[in-house]
């Protein structure tokens, strides 16, 4: 397998929020609980990272990561490539960026079809569509009106590579994702539409940012890197060891209040990447 290297590519969507609609206060649950099968628990010597997997947007990627994690494949694997304010890459048994699992490569899941049941919450209007959240993921999408003229009554959408978003690494072949993945610590719009986002860090982004970085001159390759000591879905852990994670829905009053606060602080520079999920973690 050729090196799985994450590089900037063609910009597919502008993240700058050129206008922002008033956020309506609707009747909505104050919290939602992340399903154990969609909670990836990554332990490191630096601390724990909790990732919500998003099978509605990248089902093959999520199934692959679940399978490998619960097999113990990721235990002891290195964060072999880490670039400050960009991303941390792991999941290679060789620790070089050249390796993968024995499972076949999967197709690139760079976009998905959004139906009304996804629960997209519009936050702003971008250059060519709507910007908002679905679950904990930042999303760019065509308006709902497009659903009326499509055969499946859905519209095109893609999750965005904001801080905390987790994506599948690949080589130059767009359908070469296997076991490696990367966790964003900064914003890189050039990845949008070119790599498959499949989840988001809900807790532990500060841990990711403390992982030992590599030099830019070495393309982020790390000498004596940090590693994942264990990675499992919460569903695969003994019940007494399972963390319980609750997230404020994007339409909740608490989240919408945060949006307006951040929008006021950032002004014309406001983007969906300025927003992080509001999370509560207990147990584990």
Where are these regions (language model features)?
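Bacterial N-terminal signal peptides that target proteins for export
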Residues: 1-10
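Cleavable N-terminal signal peptides
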Residues: 11-12, 22
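Cyclophilin-like peptidyl-prolyl cis-trans isomerases
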Residues: 22-284
